[in-house]
Regions:
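ATP-binding/phosphotransfer module of carbohydrate and carboxylate kinases, centering on a glycine-rich
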Residues: 1-48, 71-74, 96-99, 145-304
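N-terminal short leaders/motifs
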Residues: 22, 26-27, 57-66
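Glycine- and acidic-rich phosphate- and metal-coordinating loops
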Residues: 49-54, 84
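Glycine-rich beta-strand-to-loop/alpha-helix junction loops that act as flexible
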Residues: 53-59, 105-108, 240-250
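Phosphate-binding/catalytic loop of phosphoryl-transfer enzymes
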Residues: 60-158, 302-303
Length: 304
């Protein structure tokens, strides 16, 4: 998104595949392409940009981050730019006082908390390929794994067949052998695997026992992450307000399963979400670094 010093949104652009850890150089190219498109659509020059905030997944990939900074330097906007994690961007938006708990579940997962003294605590967030459970990618991967483990009943068991048909359609393959070849030939299957989560959640809600078992296992582990975070923060209140971010945690059924898994540790749990996207938060943070005073309220006022 692009907005002016009054908080008026002047341009929006959407694309996918900007995770620096997953897509690396391709992500950098995409980000630059998006910036060039926005500049072109607004009929401005890069020198007209007062501040640029990028809230990105995978910023721990230092090589890709450095490559992106070099591109910003080439475009002569590096001194006006700030790169931060998408989780930090979401936290700044959803926990504006600098205190609270954020559970972000999309393709990946991370639980972030800060106490009244500003001390940070983090659970999970190691990466989609490093054991983080309960995320969109994990849900998709578990569904595919169950197909391979139950090949002898794929066409007999109705629940398994429903998932099998979905996977074949999503990946445009005829059988598991073709799917395996696709995984061997293509490096970046993360987005496609994570996209399965939406279907698995839908099937689980409609009483597909296989899908339900995946969601219940995933949310049970996420509940353990949340409890671990609360313990580390020494939070003893049985009532909690947790900020949520990401497509998976915004799913009502996923959140119901997570609430069920947390009911003995948090008896009264409230979720809060933002009506505006986290891209605004990244831009606001960048603006503040350039001493430009734009607030979330300014953005919301002009959206409404």
């Amino acid at each position: 998104v692009a907005f002016n010093e009054y908080g008026q949104t002047i341009c929006k652009y959407s694309d996918s595949g900007s995770n620096l850890y997953v897509y690396k150089e391709e992500a950098v190219k995409l980000i630059v392409k998006v910036l060039e498109t926005v500049v072109s659509d607004l009929k401005i020059n890069f020198s007209d940009i007062s501040a640029l905030g990028c809230g990105l997944a995978g910023v721990s990939d230092l090589n890709s981050r450095d490559l992106l900074l070099k591109e910003f330097d080439r475009l002569k906007i590096v001194e006006k730019s700030i790169i931060l994690s998408d989780t930090e961007s979401a936290y700044q938006l959803l926990c504006p006082t600098g205190q609270g708990i954020l559970v972000s579940v999309g393709t990946g997962i991370v639980c972030l908390g800060r106490d009244k003294d500003g001390k940070s605590f983090k659970v999970a967030g190691r990466g989609y390929d490093k054991g983080d459970a309960g995320s969109g990618y994990w849900i998709g991967k578990e569904a595919i794994k169950k197909l391979y483990l139950n090949q002898n009943i794929l066409l007999i068991d109705e629940d398994m067949k429903q998932i099998y048909d979905c996977v074949k359609k999503k990946f445009n393959v005829d059988d598991l052998h073709a799917l395996e070849e696709m995984f061997n030939d293509q490096n970046n299957m993360v987005f496609k695997v994570a996209a399965l989560a939406e279907n698995i959640l839908d099937y689980a809600e409609k009483n597909n026992d296989i899908a339900l078992s995946i969601i219940q296992e995933g949310t049970r582990i996420v509940a353990e992450y949340v409890v671990c975070l609360i313990d580390e923060m020494e939070y003893t209140n049985k009532e909690a307000v947790i900020a949520g971010n990401g497509t998976i945690i915004k799913n009502d059924f996923y959140r119901k399963c997570l609430n069920d898994a947390l009911q003995f540790d948090i008896s009264n749990l409230h979720w809060i979400f933002s009506d505006i996207c986290c891209a605004y938060s990244s831009g606001i943070i960048a603006a503040q670094c350039q001493k430009i005073n734009v607030s979330v309220n300014d953005i919301i006022k002009h959206i409404n």
